[in-house]
Curated annotation (Swiss-Prot):
GO terms for cellular component: membrane. Gene3D superfamilies: Tetratricopeptide repeat domain (1.25.40.10). Pfam families: Sel1 (PF08238). Its main location: membrane. It is a single-pass membrane protein. It comes from Haemophilus influenzae (strain ATCC 51907 / DSM 11121 / KW20 / Rd). Keywords: Membrane, Transmembrane, Transmembrane helix. InterPro entries: Sel1-like (IPR006597), Sel1_AlgK (IPR050767), TPR-like_helical_dom_sf (IPR011990). This is Uncharacterized protein HI_1625.
Amino acid sequence: MKLKLFFHIVLLCFSLPIWAMKTVDVTASPKMDDQARMNLAQEFANKQQWIDVFNIMYPMALEGNITAQSNLGMLYNLGRGTVRDYEKAYWWFSEAAEKGSVKGLNNLGVMYLRGDYVKQNTEQAIKLFERTAQAKDTDAMMMLSNIYRLQNQPEKIIGMAEESR
């Protein structure tokens, strides 16, 4: 059961999108609009050029772009383009979440569920996943259904399914 939960958490981490940008000149990225920089970062991510993705996401995150903040948190969380640093991942996920990022909240939930940087706290993870599930986020719904299944609480899964209609 715990192995299945771990598998689903890993699957969630890899399914979270790392958004990106369009041209090839990273040095020009600050002069591009946000969508162009996101497109360029996506091209680099598709090629697994994580340092280039990081170099695009970091300034955007500092500028307050919540998608970039959540993506930067994931780069720190996975150690892509930078050294793995759960503290920085938590900080960037929190920044994004405070500004309304569903992905930021979900990623914080995963950190609480796994105990990465924070003390493992399933109840806190559930609270975060419930907040984003209310926004019809399917990743959060999947995480909650797995937690409820492992806790042998099928009635909560049924209730969640009925609410999502």
